[in-house]
């Protein structure tokens, strides 16, 4: 595994024209943040040694190096999901590579179903903690020496970055929620009973990604900031049939607000 990580990092280092310390993983419907990136170098996942290939509609599958405002960044346009059949090691492989390339801060975004009755479709929820409901753990097996065998997860999402985001949202007049994200394997959307269970467990939103990458980032010593776009509601009386297209539409409508917060945060760290 370590050899593969180093091989991929060496390949990318030879192509890179910048030295980013910040990376972004862009989720469903949020890939258009790439239009803000200047001085771009793009490479398709299929052309990167050892990289899996994303199969989800709306995920274009590219690694992008460039500038967002005045900061060098690395962006993943399209992520890998456990439900696609990848192992957890494959899902999180790009995060290991980020660590090898010198990334210090990771921004993650996703689309999620809200289980909190105070949430509305289109809300941005700053993730302050998560619950890992996946059946497999990304650190299962031999420890990769980027971090300890038993990593601390008491601050999986940086409090400093959360405070900065709240400050920016207030300054820009953007409404944000805060909450706990629960990650499940999918690919089915949740039943009403599952939504109810997740809420009882302490989750405010549920989705099919993010948690594995965040666990690995924490193991590697990378600071994390995460945001969910609430694209459907799993609240009694508000549950309706949901499709991938509707999720995408809600995420696209939230994109300008997400872009503003992400751009400002990256330029202020």
Describe the residue ranges of each PLM region.
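Non-catalytic positions within long, well-ordered alpha-helices that form the structural scaffold/packing
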Residues: 99-102, 199, 218
């Amino acid at each position: 595994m370590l050899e593969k990580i180093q091989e991929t990092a060496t390949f990318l280092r030879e192509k890179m024209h910048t030295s980013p310390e910040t990376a972004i993983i862009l989720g469903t419907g949020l890939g258009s943040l790439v239009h803000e990136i200047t001085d771009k170098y793009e490479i398709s996942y299929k052309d990167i040694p050892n990289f899996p290939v994303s199969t989800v509609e709306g995920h274009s599958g590219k690694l992008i190096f460039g500038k967002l405002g005045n900061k060098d960044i690395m962006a993943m346009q399209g992520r890998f999901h456990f439900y696609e059949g990848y192992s957890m090691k494959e899902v999180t492989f790009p995060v290991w590579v980020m660590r090898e390339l010198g990334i210090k801060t990771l921004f993650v975004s996703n689309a999620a179903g809200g289980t909190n009755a105070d949430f509305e479709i289109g809300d941005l929820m700053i993730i302050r903690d998560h619950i890992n409901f996946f059946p497999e753990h990304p650190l299962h097996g031999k420890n990769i020496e980027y971090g300890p065998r038993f990593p601390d997860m008491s601050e999986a999402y940086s409090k400093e970055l959360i405070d900065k985001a709240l400050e920016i949202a207030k300054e820009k007049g953007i409404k944000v929620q805060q909450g706990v994200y629960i990650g499940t394997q999918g690919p089915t959307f949740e039943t009403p009973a599952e939504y109810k269970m997740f809420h009882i467990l302490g989750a405010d939103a549920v989705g099919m990604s993010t948690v594995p990458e965040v666990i690995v980032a924490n193991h590697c010593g990378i600071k994390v900031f995460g945001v969910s776009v609430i694209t459907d509601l799993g609240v009694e009386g508000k549950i309706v049939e949901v499709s991938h297209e509707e999720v995408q539409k809600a995420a696209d409508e939230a994109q300008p607000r997400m872009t503003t917060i992400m751009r400002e945060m990256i330029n202020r760290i």
